[in-house]
Structures are given as structure tokens and as C-alpha cells.
Amino acid sequence: MAISDWPASERPREKLLERGPDALSDAELLAIFLRTGCKGRSAVDLARELLSTFGGLRALLAADCKAFCQGLGLGEAKYVQLQAVLEMSKRHLGETLQRQTQFANSQSVKDFLNSQLRHRRSEVFAALFLDSQHRLLSFDILFNGTIDGAAVYPREVVKKCLAHNAAAVIFAHNHPSGVAEPSEADRQITDRLCRALQLLDIRTLDHIVVGEGDAVSFADRGWL
């Protein structure tokens, strides 16, 4: 049955307008983006099939162009559109974070880092550079790694802190495996960075590890 034949209250677009985007499932939100179905399937049917094929929204958003275009009814134009929407979402969160006078709690930082790092297929190490009032100066990806890890060099981190004239820093990296639990190596490199920055009176406020739908804060665990 075509979506146009559904009751108005069940059509994704009408449902969003009436009840807000939070009321829609992943498939319904994706269907609005897709706009049309194909080969006898409605946009919602196609969206459900895509989510099933990729194993969920996270994997779909993280897919490269080749993998994405193998999906039924999808091509480069849809891939470009989806990446543009994803990037706008990241930038929106980034602007929101920058406009805060200071960080009220770690949750807003986790939300931002989730948006920036969760969908990456390889591990990256990043930092939020802050002024003396804990306002954001810059968010930088410092090191890129493989699926297994990213090499982190304290000397380069120090250079970045000085370049931004940062008074404090929050480190972050992702675990492409989806498991956010920090490793012993994560704790060791954090200790090394803390010691290096202490010599310059730069505070390490937190190190957040981003997994799939979860983020672990070193500060919340009392490790800093």
C-alpha cells in the first residue's frame, strides 16, 4: 500500500508535523529523507529494508559511497544528500556548544562528541580546547588511526594547546568496535598527556571515549 493511502495520522510527514520528530521511528525518519520507495515498496518499507541490511542507523550513516549505493534504489545523489544532512547536524551541535558560556555538565560535551566521532569507521583522537572560563576555542581531530587504534604524540598535543592559547582541554577518541569501555592503554596515554600539560599549567578536564550509543567519561569515574 502506498503511503498516500495510509491514514493521515500514520504518514511520516504528517506524523512529524503533528507530534514532532521524536515520535517517529528510525525507519519513518529515513523514509522522509528517501521521499519515495521503489519496486512496489513504500518509502517506509525501503527504509526498514535498508536499516536491516546495514544493521541499523549508525552503520547506514557510516557507510561509504560504494556500500551505500549498493542499497536498493540508492545512488550517489542520495549519498551526497545524506552526508550533507549529517554534516549539518554535526555543525549545529558544534555551534550550540561554542555559544555556551561554559560547560554546565559533561552530557552536552558527550552529545557533541557522539555526533562527531560515533560514526567514524577508524579510530581518531580529538580534543576540545578551552579558555580559562571553559568556553570552547576549537575542536580538532589530532590523530587518525586504523580500526585498531590511533597513535598519540604528547609533543604534538602540547603544540596544539599553545597554538590555541588553551587553558584547559578535554580529550576524546572513538572505539569503532562500539564498546566505549576505556582500555589500559587509554588510561596510560591520558596520564602522559596530563603530566605534559601540567608543566604548562594547562588543565586536563576529561577524556571521553565514544562507543555506539554510549560514552565513558574519565572525570565521571574519578580518574582525573
Swiss-Prot record:
Pfam family, one: UPF0758_N
Binding site for Zn(2+): H173, H175, D186
GO molecular function, one term: metallopeptidase activity
Chain ranges of the MPN domain: 102-224
Highest taxon listed in the record's lineage: Bacteria
Keyword Zinc: yes
Extent of motif JAMM motif: 173-186
Record keywords, A-Z: Hydrolase, Metal-binding, Metalloprotease, Protease, Zinc
GO biological process: proteolysis
Database matches in PANTHER family: DNA REPAIR PROTEIN RADC, UPF0758 PROTEIN YEES-RELATED
Protein name according to UniProt: UPF0758 protein TERTU_0184
Lineage: Bacteria, Pseudomonadati, Pseudomonadota, Gammaproteobacteria, Cellvibrionales
